């Protein structure tokens, strides 16, 4: 589903940031949001995401298999979005203390809904947001 898109991260009752790309996919935006959050904060971090793509990679150790097998997936195909996965995996490994938890999207989770709203706004307006 290439097209314009937005990403966002939100700290409950705290800061937030959002951005956009003119041509992207939802998976790339989920990765970008996670990478930006991991790069922004020091210390222990809990990433709560509605992206099984991101959460399962770390929870189930996909990334370790990718590194061992030369960046091919279980289907023996090149891992998609490697240009974002590599810096994200490197950042998570370098800092440690990053945990991942999945939350169902559009299910009434206040902060997931807020991140989604900000991502849609950034993508629609083609602008960066922060606060």
Model-based region annotation:
Residues 1-4, 16, 20, 34-114, ...:
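RNase H catalytic domain
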Residues 5-12:
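Short beta-strand scaffold segments in enzyme catalytic cores
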Residues 13-30:
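A short, polar/acidic, helix/strand-boundary loop motif
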């Amino acid at each position: 589903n290439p097209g314009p898109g937005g990403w966002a991260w939100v700290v409950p009752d705290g800061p937030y940031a959002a951005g956009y790309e003119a041509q992207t996919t939802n998976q790339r935006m989920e990765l970008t949001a996670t990478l930006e959050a991991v790069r922004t904060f020091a210390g222990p971090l809990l990433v709560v995401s509605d992206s099984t793509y991101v959460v399962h990679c770390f929870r189930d150790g996909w990334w370790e298999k990718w590194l061992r097998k030369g960046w091919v997936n279980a289907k023996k195909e090149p891992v998609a979005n490697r240009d974002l996965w590599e810096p994200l995996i490197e950042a998570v490994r370098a800092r440690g203390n990053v945990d991942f938890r999945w939350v169902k999207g559009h299910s009434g989770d206040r902060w997931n809904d807020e991140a989604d709203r900000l991502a849609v706004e950034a993508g629609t307006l083609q602008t960066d947001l922060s606060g």
